[in-house]
């Protein structure tokens, strides 16, 4: 009765069941016979818990990462013809919001842009801002652009 209430034994049982499930999934489609489940060694299991968290998720049910089977080509963006203009707007006014950019695009070409394109414009503006920020930081240009503040003289 005490074994069933022990959370460590319950956890060890869950891990053993996951390991068996992982073996079954690996042997799926093969005419492999069923194996007897391994006996749970509580001492070995508790010792492995001390360092298991450092290795990450290594259980049999989690061992295969998802891999997309076919790469899909990137679709051309609706913003590509207007990219130089948008970048010029952002350089002139870095605090310009994506909604304001979309408003300007709608006024420039109402047949192509609607209010539904806001998320697309937001993602593009965010990517361009990150690109510019990376250039500023990596070039060391941020030190030239930062305002020099004068410290008040202490008396």
Swiss-Prot record:
<feature type="compositionally biased region" description="Basic residues">
    <location>
        <begin position="60"/>
        <end position="73"/>
    </location>
</feature>
<feature type="region of interest" description="Disordered">
    <location>
        <begin position="56"/>
        <end position="79"/>
    </location>
</feature>
<keyword id="KW-0614">Plasmid</keyword>
<protein>
    <recommendedName>
        <fullName>Putative uncharacterized protein y4rL</fullName>
    </recommendedName>
</protein>
